[in-house]
């Protein structure tokens, strides 16, 4: 737009053309303030003239660059600029953001929302993939164990199968030999126990028939386990010898029956006591 003023006649009868002014923002701050003060005064004067000439109600608000408010109002509009409510409304309108700023803020909010939506989508995808992977692993495991569940394999067979796999396909003949040896050892143990029981009973009877003096001779239960075994063996040998020899009316002395009484497991005092005991005749006890 351009501001064109009408020409005025001169003394020579020629009209002088007025200069044209381009309407745009003034970059110079000093010139901007001067223009504001002049134009403000002129527009206030025009508003007053308009209200007087036409009898209309006029309200004019002019706000400076520094935030000062200049007003012109007819009597009916005076409460708007004089009362506190009107001033607060004017201040609220001045504090409101411009349309351009609002548009920029809305665009920025939309961009942020889009970014948030994209991040949420990216987060949901890995979370959805994890349950799918877990389900696949479970299905594969169930398929691998399906034939075991259908056949109802016992726990012992399953353990043997695992052991055979760990051994790396060992020879089945060796496994059968090992099982036979285990079975043989298990059967031989009860037989040994049955053989030992009569021997122990016989040894106890022999000891009861031949009492020993309590002085100088330790009790069999107080000796070591090795000594007890040695004595039991000696008693068994003596019993066998007695069974082999013919029975006669004359009893032989105990020195012959207990030829090995001086055991290497006894000390010197015990050996002396044994020799003294066996050298004495024991015929009166029978």
Swiss-Prot record:
Residue ranges, compositional bias (Low complexity): 122-136, 171-246
Residues in MADS-box domain copies: 18-72
Superkingdom classification of source: Eukaryota
Subcellular location(s) of the protein: Nucleus
CDD domains with a match to the protein in the record: MADS_SRF_like
UniProt KW Acetylation keyword: yes
Function, in words: Transcription factor required for the efficient replication of minichromosomes and the transcriptional regulation of early cell cycle genes. Activates transcription of ECB-dependent genes during the G1/M phase. Genes that contain a ECB (early cell box) element in their transcription regulatory region are transcribed only during G1/M phases. Interacts with the alpha-2 repressor or with the alpha-1 activator thereby regulating the expression of mating-type-specific genes. With ARG80, ARG81 and ARG82, coordinates the expression of arginine anabolic and catabolic genes in response to arginine.
One BP annotation, GO: regulation of mating-type specific transcription, DNA-templated
Region annotation (Disordered) ranges: 97-137, 167-264
GO cellular component: chromatin; cytosol; nucleus; RNA polymerase II transcription regulator complex; RNA polymerase II transcription repressor complex
GO molecular function: DNA replication origin binding; DNA-binding transcription activator activity, RNA polymerase II-specific; DNA-binding transcription factor activity, RNA polymerase II-specific; DNA-binding transcription repressor activity, RNA polymerase II-specific; molecular sequestering activity; protein dimerization activity; RNA polymerase II cis-regulatory region sequence-specific DNA binding; RNA polymerase II cis-regulatory region sequence-specific DNA binding, bending
Note in the entry: Present with 8970 molecules/cell in log phase SD medium.
Bias (Acidic residues): 97-119
SUPFAM superfamilies: SRF-like
Residues recorded as bearing N-acetylserine in the entry: 2
Keywords of this entry: Acetylation, Activator, Arginine metabolism, Cell cycle, DNA-binding, Nucleus, Phosphoprotein, Transcription, Transcription regulation
Name assigned to this protein: Pheromone receptor transcription factor
Subunit text: Homodimer. Binds DNA with a high specificity in complex with mating-type protein ALPHA1. Also binds DNA with a high specificity as a heterotetramer consisting of an ALPHA2 dimer and an MCM1 dimer. Interacts with YHP1 and YOX1, possibly leading to its inactivation. Interacts with ARG80 and ARG82.
PTM-bearing positions, type Phosphoserine: 2, 144
